[in-house]
Amino acid sequence: MAFLSTTARQTLLGFALGAASAGASAIPLTIPTTYLDAEATYTFDADTASLMYLMGVSVHALGNTQAVKGSDWQFMMPVTQVTLNASILPLGLTPVSGFATGSGLMIQSETGALTLANFGLDFKRNVLTADLGTSAGISKAFDVYSFTVDQGLHVSTSGGLSMAMNLSHMTLTSGAQAQFATALQLDELAVSVLPMLNFGTLDVNISPALRFGVSDKSLVAAIPEPPRFATLGLGLLGLAFVARRRLS
């Protein structure tokens, strides 16, 4: 632990000196956190979770993601990398991006499903990205949620480098609304309320404690298959087409 504390201070000192030599410009500092106790806890808003439950929509953990015991709507995702801007004038660190590579979620309705994998946080745009998978394929680094930074980055070097921040009011981007509506086969009423839904909060906490057994390899989530009834419908359409060709 003393080694981690010393290393963290040396790293910050080195970048501070670099920033000083570069004047007021910020220097990007990328920190791999796969082997640190770095977690992002995603909690669905209670009202949105209740509505999703009534609509028959459920959420399941994939890859590194773990469901919090006793809850169907809270998930922990290991943070694998963060990038900060270090500046000397004024002295400080500001978040640039963060990644939870290897983590994923499956969102499933009674008639369809989609997957979200390899989450990223873009603090320049305040957007959460993920590889979005549907029966049509996978869209890499898709803009899923817009968010508000409720509690800005808090950094401490006491006992080692630690960071914490809180994101709230996560709402679907316009592109994600269209993908959710199509993939989950939502009815018109459900589609109309998508823009108004708060999908919850994300709490990020990083401490200098070591951890093992976390993979930072990209998660390749299985592409959700069309629902059984939709597949049956396509099969019947195919049989009808063949029968018509034979009659002609």
Describe each model-derived feature in a short phrase.
Residues R245-S248:
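Short, charged juxtamembrane terminal tails flanking transmembrane helices
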Residues A26-S97, Q177, L186-A222:
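N-terminal segment immediately downstream of the Sec signal-peptide cleavage site
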Residues T11-A16, L234:
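Sec-dependent N-terminal signal peptides
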Residues S21-G23:
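N-terminal signal peptide c-region/cleavage motif recognized by signal peptidases
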Residues A2-L12:
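Bacterial N-terminal signal peptides that target proteins for export
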Residues P224-A243:
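A short, hydrophobic C-terminal helix/tail in secreted or cell-surface proteins
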Residues N64-V149:
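Predominantly extracellular/secreted and cell-surface proteins with exposed
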Residues S139-Q177:
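Extended amphipathic ligand-handling, pore-lining, and cofactor/metal-binding catalytic surfaces
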